[in-house]
Amino acid sequence: MSKLNKTILADFEAAQIQRQLPEFNQGDTVVVNVKVKEGNRERVQAYEGVVIGTKNAGLNSAFTVRKISHGFGVERVFQTHSAIIDSVEVKRRGKVRAGKLYYLRGLEGKAARIKEDLAAAAQAKAARQAAAKAE
């Protein structure tokens, strides 16, 4: 690809990346509000689970959320800059050491729990309070 095409592509991607989602990592419990179209009406559906992996690739960035629904593990891959994502809310910060948490697929019940990262949660809370004071 020529240098001109690369710069045009980079400019296009920068213009498309407008959404500012909260910072989250693997192990965090998040609620992803997804726009669902049913017939001619549109509604927002919440999908809550643990982030088991992220892929950071500019406009093609994605993250995978896993939840247990009726005893079965369900994973869903969301494109970070997709228009169907209404919002993302971080419920709980997890303390993990691995980059991808695929090992959770083989665990059940209490073994699949993730320890909470209290330091990161306190830091996020302080940042929210500082932002509220600034307004």
UniProtKB/Swiss-Prot annotation:
Pfam families: Ribosomal_L19. One of its GO terms (biological process) is translation. Signal peptide: none annotated. The keyword Ribonucleoprotein applies. The keyword Manganese does not apply. It comes from the Bacteria. GO terms for molecular function: structural constituent of ribosome. GO terms for cellular component: cytosolic large ribosomal subunit. Keywords: Ribonucleoprotein, Ribosomal protein. Belongs to the bacterial ribosomal protein bL19 family. This protein is located at the 30S-50S ribosomal subunit interface and may play a role in the structure and function of the aminoacyl-tRNA binding site. This is Large ribosomal subunit protein bL19. It comes from Xanthomonas campestris pv. campestris (strain ATCC 33913 / DSM 3586 / NCPPB 528 / LMG 568 / P 25).
